[in-house]
Amino acid sequence: MHPSLYITGAGVSAESGIPTFRGQDGFWTIGSANYTPQQMATRAMYMQRPAEFLLWYYRRFAQYRHLQPNRVHRWLADKKLITQNIDGLDGKAGNVDYIPIHGRLDKVTVLHDQGAEVELLDAPWQQVADNQDAPNDDGHLKTALLDAFRISSTTQTPQMNQSLKPFVLLFDEYYTELYRMSVAQNWLLSATKMVFIGTSFSVGITDIALQCALQNNAPVHIVDPDPVDLGVDGIHYHRMTAAEFIASQ
């Protein structure tokens, strides 16, 4: 059996300055229409409107790539950890074998059929930054992004096995081995205790994890200032921030 397994969400990285992008702050405007993160973060949006998708991804995530881990990341550095966050801060904090189950901001892949074996490549964010004539001009930024991601600015159609796609699990995609899903399932099934920190239980991995814990009678702890009531008996709720929780341990 593995020791305690920690499963983290956006609440852990908030102290580092990364917004959670839920609620009003998460809306994105294209023309006169507002889109939610659930509408923007889709494979369909990437395929149909790659310039808008990449601009959204850059503004909402890539521009925070230089931020540093906080005390919670450092506390988790020697823990068995699955994170929903793509910011890579757990790796920066020194956790050498954590699972970024939704991908990593600093990596991309070639566009491929889901489930195919592909190599992780370094994300071309610096190339994008270097090629911006006017950093605050969305038009120039879109051109730089399309070029860096190998997408024709004329056709604006991503090409299979040629164009690049951010290494991120989108809402209309599913978990594959690219995201180390088999290893994650092994950890979930063999955990003696699960501690969820800063997650709203709004994505698939948290539901899978909770079911594994209940199946194995593993204690479940939820750390959140305003936790979601899961309606399950026996769950230990810690109504506090992640920083307050680690200070109490």
Residue spans of the language-model regions?
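Conserved catalytic core of sirtuin-type NAD+-dependent deacylases
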Residues: 1-249
